Amino acid sequence: MPIISKYTDDQVEKILAEVGAVLTKHKASPELSLMIAGNIATNVLNQNVAASQRKGIAEKFAEALISSLEDKKSH
């Protein structure tokens, strides 16, 4: 079953393009890009989510990330 998002593909793609442009501008390696993405996720959780919910949300985020990689393999 597909996941339905409250955000449009256009919203997500615009922000992703801007973030990608910043990483390209700074010639960020894949390792640095992933480190930055991880730090952003950590900061969002720590600053915007109750401590009691952080671990559960982080686990769901990790599951979604892994799932998105597995989906790519089948194409």
UniProtKB/Swiss-Prot annotation:
One Pfam family in the UniProt entry: DUF1414
InterPro entries attached to this UniProt entry: UPF0352, YejL_sf
Family: Belongs to the UPF0352 family.
Name of this protein: UPF0352 protein VS_0950
